[in-house]
Amino acid sequence: MSLTYYYAPQSTASVTTLVLEELGIPCERVKLDIRKGETKKPEFLKINPNGCVPTIVDEGVAIWESVAITMYLGEKFGEKAKLWPAAGPKRGEAMKWLVWTHVTLGEAVYRWARNTMWAPEDQRNANAAATATKDIGKLLRLLDDALRERPFLTGEYTLADAHVNSFVDWLRHMKIDMDGLELLGAWSKRCSERPAYARAMERENG
């Protein structure tokens, strides 16, 4: 078994857990306890000097950052499984949504979280939080509109849908307002009804 997956349940690794379930590929799973500092131990820092999950090691090469992992697994395993577009514009579209989620939407979410729950109360900026909330709403409407004429982000379900929906799930858990985003809600429901999603949730909660 050449693929090793380092993860922690209920963390930023959740999306990779879902991607692996969708692909159904065998791997060695190494569970790390973030609260106990296991991601900061020297033996793990040799694999990922950032000290964070998710991280995979395939054929002796360490790959970190969830977007990079999804793209890599998609290219290596996903095309054959019909979960990743062949090289061409559709693959570019899938990659676009992955990067948009973590860069454009992610930046607004970071500003919101920084000023609502991550920073000490005396270091939070209510105006910045309000602006971030508006920006998140605008971006989610953009995503909703992109689903107006197609059931999934590139037309057919791919790992991009799994990945982006995992992020949307987290926003919903954080009580981000999604009222009125009916297309987004229906898309998320379709993604969440897949068997791989149920298996991933079992791993997350097990």
What are these regions (language model features)?
Residues M1-N127, D144:
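GST-like domain detector, emphasizing the conserved glutathione-binding G-site
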Residues E28-V30, G155, D179, R199:
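A local structural micro-motif
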Residues I34-R35, G185, N205:
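Conserved beta-strand edge residues that scaffold enzyme active sites
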Residues K46, E193, E202:
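Phosphate-coordinating loops and pocket residues in cytosolic domains that bind phosphorylated ligands
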Residues G74, F167-V168, M201:
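Active-site-flanking alpha-helical
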Residues A86, E156, R199-G206:
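Short, flexible loop/turn segments with low-complexity composition
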Residues L98-E193:
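GST-like fold's C-terminal all-alpha helical module
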